From Swiss-Prot:
Entry protein name: DNA-directed RNA polymerase subunit alpha
Gene of this entry: rpoA
GO cellular component: cytoplasm; DNA-directed RNA polymerase complex
Source organism phylogeny: Bacteria, Pseudomonadati, Pseudomonadota, Gammaproteobacteria, Pseudomonadales
Gene3D superfamilies: 5' to 3' exonuclease, C-terminal subdomain, DNA-directed RNA polymerase, insert domain, RNA polymerase, RBP11-like subunit
GO terms of molecular function: DNA binding; DNA-directed RNA polymerase activity; protein dimerization activity
Organism, scientific name: Pseudomonas fluorescens (strain ATCC BAA-477 / NRRL B-23932 / Pf-5)
Domain comment quoted from the record: The N-terminal domain is essential for RNAP assembly and basal transcription, whereas the C-terminal domain is involved in interaction with transcriptional regulators and with upstream promoter elements.
Length: 333
């Protein structure tokens, strides 16, 4: 199979192998040599750092003033409880932040199912253990759940309002990403006689709030959106190209006097040897502002008059001035 050096193979086969409800293996092939690592590493970084999700960012526990406390009748200390709260897989439908409550007493296991939920809040892992209570134990707490992206340490959420925050409101370092683990390998692939191609295999596991296949789709969309700016890359000062036909637009051959500019503006243009509209539209704003006695007010007037005729400054004309105009100039001379 002969392929031009300017052409690249594009993946023609994608396979999704569902290992569990929260884990999947995605295979993409064939890829040009080296593109397996290029795409795999880019997607891996986006999945780990840029996927939005929800997490507990603050907890307030009755009888607890700081995270180094212990609660009577509770097997875990406060630090262990906070670590367990980080394992909650929560989905918010419609809101960016909510406050939830948990209240339980007596011997038994405290799980995510004991949290009192609002109508637009969902906990995907209700069996997740938060603490274990003895017969004389009780656990009452308020949890603030927020939507975010990536990893956010507690220090980054501190503000001037922290001084007025009541004692006992414990801030948590939060990992919002629904992706728990991702790894990729690049294997060999073959298409007809070409054996030096790549096959990308991504092994992805989430916390259940996001389907693995949907996570890959979102990561690819983010990457596509970020690279789109390079696809449409253009220079800031690129002149506008005027489509040329067999004959030049007659309006470009008319003298600038036909624009009915003020005497000041017209004299400034003639002083710069700008006699025809075709000469004028090829000048830029910067060039005109360098003209003696031509200020921003005159420049605005010129731009408005040209715009009324469908023209603008900074346009480019091929084969200007035309031969007929040169002959007229010589005859006048």
């Amino acid at each position: 199979m002969q392929i031009s050096v300017n052409e690249f193979l594009t993946p023609r086969h994608i396979d999704v192998q569902v290992v569990s409800p929260t884990r999947a293996k995605i295979t993409l092939e064939p890829l040009e040599r080296g593109f397996g690592h290029t795409l795999g590493n880019a997607l891996r970084r986006i999945l780990l750092s840029s996927m939005p999700g929800c997490a507990v960012v603050e907890a307030e526990i009755d009888g607890v003033l700081h995270e180094y406390s212990a609660i009577e009748g509770v097997q875990e200390d406060v630090i262990e409880i906070l670590l367990n709260l980080k394992g909650l897989a929560i989905k918010l439908h419609g809101r960016d932040e909510v406050t939830l409550t948990l209240s339980k007493k007596g011997s038994g296991v405290v799980t995510a199912a004991d949290i009192q939920l609002d109508h637009d809040v969902e906990i995907v892992n209700p069996d997740h253990v938060i603490a274990n209570l003895a017969s004389n134990g009780a656990l009452n707490m308020k949890l603030v759940v927020a939507r975010g992206r990536g990893y956010e340490p507690a220090d980054s959420r501190q503000s001037d309002e922290d001084e007025s925050r009541s004692i006992g409101r414990l801030q948590l370092d939060s990992s919002f990403s629904p992706v728990r683990r991702i790894a990729y390998v690049v294997e060999n692939a073959r298409v007809e006689q070409r054996t030096n191609l790549d096959k990308l295999v991504i092994d992805l596991e989430t916390n259940g709030t996001l389907d693995p296949e949907e996570a890959i789709r979102r990561a690819a969309t983010i990457l596509q959106q970020q690279l789109a700016a390079f696809v449409d890359l253009k220079g800031d000062s690129e002149p506008v190209v005027v489509e040329q036909e067999d004959e030049i637009d007659p309006i470009l051959l008319r003298p600038v006097d036909d624009l009915e500019l003020t005497v000041r503006s017209a004299n400034c243009l003639k002083a710069e040897n700008i006699y025809y509209i075709g000469d004028l539209i090829q000048r830029t704003e910067v060039e005109l502002l360098k003209t003696p006695n031509l200020g921003k007010k005159s420049l605005t007037e010129i731009k408005d008059v040209l715009a009324s005729r469908g023209l603008s400054l900074g346009m480019r004309l091929d084969n200007w001035p035309p031969a007929s105009l040169k002959k007229d100039d010589k005859a006048t001379a």
